[in-house]
């Protein structure tokens, strides 16, 4: 089959990343689509799952198994557990992820138990939280930095971890790529192959519009865990004491509305969901709109260089570094200019997608 005649379906991901990826594939000459186009999935020669493994159940739903299964590529954006996950912590993690009636009893009986058996949901939550607390305690003993990771985030991470192992052991994933080295190292440590390719810039993330920057500091995201809310509350008070306003927007903000908002923003605050990994989304959307990213300290920022592409500090020092960059326009603009050139030039999505397909032996370009 001619490489350019490949039909590639892109499964849903966060922040329209699936639309960006599909558009990049079309620009590279491939026939690509997302669920929005309502095309028959059986037409696909390749399926790319962006973000995590949760969506892989559609292979079973559409009976895309055996000889009918297309090539499956996983491009992991969301975090997996840290590399130093101990054997005991791994047992707690997998036990917590399996506290699910459908997993324990099968889909049909599990749904019945979950829906109709009194206190089934409450019992599941109690058992699961016990395992998650044990996991958190074990990992905090290994690294005190993990102590701030909320139980909610541990829950998401361990579900992702269990699904990944299940699908890999079933042979349902042909190629694995990660957007950070931390995830790649964890997967290799499990005995599977993975390669690091960062997610790249697409115009949907944003563009420079030349607006007056009248928003000092912006945090864009959900305050759906206790730690994040605690950090925001403290920062709000510290910045207000210095005459700086922190704007927090929790609702979804997409496309042009988000781009306009970021073009009015001087500093975009990045708070980590987990201490050992980070997502690329805030970096790409902020840098492409000329806003300075000020982040909690990232263990492995990789391609993004602190002091060159963004600023970082310990959580307790965030207010201080924010005030420093607000007072020094030239220093802030030096970093935002460098960051803009980096993401819109070197980190183009089409370039990274082409590299990904080449490593899957699906493209020679």
Regions found by a protein language model. Give the residues of each.
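Nucleotide-sugar donor-binding catalytic core of glycosyltransferases
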Residues: 2-44, 49-307
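Generic C-terminal helix-cap and adjacent flexible tail
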Residues: 361-365
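Short, hydrophobic/aromatic alpha-helical segments in well-folded domains
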Residues: 172, 282, 321, 338-339
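C-terminal "capping" alpha-helix adjacent to the active site of nucleotide-linked donor transferases
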Residues: 314-331
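A charged, aromatic-enriched C-terminal amphipathic alpha-helix characteristic of glycosyltransferases
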Residues: 326-360
